[in-house]
Structure formats: structure tokens, C-alpha cells
Curated annotation (Swiss-Prot):
Changing E44K: In strain: Berkeley and L28. It comes from Drosophila melanogaster (Fruit fly). Changing R215S: In strain: L126. This is Fat body protein 2. Substrate binds at S138. The lineage of its organism: Eukaryota, Metazoa, Ecdysozoa, Arthropoda, Hexapoda. The keyword Metal-binding does not apply. Changing Y171H: In strain: L12. PANTHER family: 15-HYDROXYPROSTAGLANDIN DEHYDROGENASE [NAD(+)], ALCOHOL DEHYDROGENASE-RELATED. The keyword Protease does not apply. NAD(+) binds at residues 10-34. Belongs to the short-chain dehydrogenases/reductases (SDR) family. The gene is Fbp2. Keywords: Oxidoreductase. GO terms for molecular function: alcohol dehydrogenase (NAD+) activity; nutrient reservoir activity; oxidoreductase activity, acting on the CH-OH group of donors, NAD or NADP as acceptor.
Length: 256
């Protein structure tokens, strides 16, 4: 089981949804410091987060995932402030299929950039002590999503990156493990305007099916994801659907 005592946690993402619920629940652990990284600060939500556990130092760092320089500068400041990073949770997610650049940048390339720039503060051969990176994907990273093809491409990319970085050779050298979470349909801001964010205008029936489907609450999904993290399975992928946790066993199609 993962020991949260004295850990420095970095969260890259918004002030809502599953990722934010994870932060609220992690504040109840005996962690040392929590750093929130996002393009805009929500002062009220930061105060609420701090109030959960006044003994944890909570800080905010502005960072734009669409700008490499912003990521580099913000992650350097966060790493120096903490000294080292134990846990990094990449929880940013947008569903804007008509804006390919933003969808890929916010969901995938920005996540990759921020992770790679955090690694010097996690890698035990550099300034880190080892740790864990958790990347938020989706069930649409495992299956096709005809109504949201661009979003699905980004989600598939997250899993490819996570599984590759979760190779045992990388873990043995760096001490950093990687995991991916694939939530199913969840009550969140992301799915409030589905009809405006489809890939094609031929997707009405697919959107209707999603809108009428049952959804889990972000709180229950967050709880299960933290449970998965505590199992410490490097390179693993987890589905969290309707509050139930299930590990994904990928099919091996090719091996060198």
C-alpha cells in the first residue's frame, strides 16, 4: 500500500470534476504539500481546499498547458518550492472536438510536456526520490468514440504514453511509476454541452444515447482512483465506471 505520509502532491487540472474531488480526498491524508496548477486560479475553491486540512501547505501555480514556456517555468517553480515531487496527477480534460489544436494540446501534448518537465523533481537519479504519475484518460481511450473522434485520439494517446513510461526498465532507473485512469460517464462540466462539441454534425443519435445514460458521481470515481493508486501497480490502467474499479489487461499484439 502507498504511504501518503509527508508526500508532496502536484495536481494539474481544473477546480471541478474527478481530479478536484481527488484533491479534496487526498487533503484528508497525512500529506505535506499540495500544489495546484491551472491557467486560472479559483481563490474560493483554494480556500475550501485548505480548510479541509490546515496542516497541509496548499499552493497555486499558474500554468497554461498550451504554452511550452509556461509549463517549463511553472513546473520549475513548483519543483523548487517543493524540493521534490512525490505524486503528480494529470487531471486536465476538455471536450472540444471542433477545436483540434486545443483538444490535443490540453488533453495530450500539454500533459506530456508537464510530465517530462516534472520528472527531474521525481527521478531518484536527479532531484527526486521516486514517486507516482497518474494520468487521467477515459473509457474512450480504450474504445472508439464516433461522436468525439478527436477527444478519443487524445485519450488513446494518454494510454500509449502512460504504458510506455510505465515500462519496468524506466521504473527501475527512476523510481517513478505510471498509472492511467479511465473513468466512464461522470457528472461533470465536460458533458454539459455535448451537442456543441461533436466531431461531425451526424452524431445526434450517439449524443442522445450518452445524455440518457446513467452517470457516476465524481466523488465516488475519485475514491476508487485513489484506491487504485494505493495498489502501486506500475504501468497499469483502470476503468472506473458507476463507482466500480476494474483493472484493464491489454492485449499483446506485437513484441520485439
Amino acid at each position: 500500500m502507498f504511504d501518503w505520509t509527508g508526500k508532496n502532491v502536484v495536481y494539474v487540472g481544473s477546480f471541478s470534476g474527478i481530479g478536484w474531488q481527488m484533491m479534496m480526498q487526498l487533503m484528508q491524508k497525512d500529506i505535506k504539500m499540495m500544489g495546484i496548477m491551472h491557467r486560472m486560479e479559483n481563490v474560493e475553491m483554494m480556500k475550501k481546499l485548505q480548510a479541509i486540512n490546515p496542516s497541509v501547505k496548499v499552493v497555486f501555480m499558474q500554468m497554461n498547458l498550451m504554452e511550452k514556456m509556461s509549463i517549463e517555468q511553472a513546473m520549475k517553480k513548483m519543483g523548487q518550492m517543493m524540493g521534490h515531487i512525490d505524486v503528480m496527477i494529470n487531471g486536465e480534460g476538455v471536450l472540444l472536438d471542433k477545436d483540434v489544436e486545443t483538444t490535443m494540446g490540453m488533453n495530450l501534448t500539454g500533459m506530456i510536456q508537464s510530465t517530462m518537465m516534472a520528472m527531474p523533481y521525481m527521478d531518484k537519479t536527479q532531484m527526486g526520490m521516486g514517486g507516482m504519475v497518474v494520468n487521467m484518460s477515459s473509457v474512450y481511450g480504450l474504445e472508439p468514440a464516433p461522436a468525439f473522434a478527436v477527444y478519443a485520439a487524445a485519450m488513446h494517446g494518454i494510454l500509449g504514453f502512460t504504458r510506455s513510461m510505465g515500462d519496468k526498465m524506466i521504473y527501475q532507473k527512476t523510481g517513478v511509476m505510471f498509472m492511467a485512469m479511465c473513468p466512464g460517464l461522470t457528472n461533470s462540466e465536460m458533458i454539459m454541452n455535448l451537442r456543441d462539441n461533436v466531431t461531425w454534425h451526424h452524431s445526434e443519435s450517439m449524443v442522445e444515447a450518452i445524455e440518457s445514460a446513467k452517470r457516476q458521481m465524481p466523488e465516488e470515481a475519485a475514491m476508487q482512483m485513489i484506491h487504485a493508486m494505493e495498489m502501486m501497480k506500475n504501468g497499469s490502467m483502470w476503468i472506473v465506471s458507476m463507482g466500480q474499479l476494474k483493472e484493464v489487461t491489454p492485449t499483446m499484439h506485437w513484441q520485439m
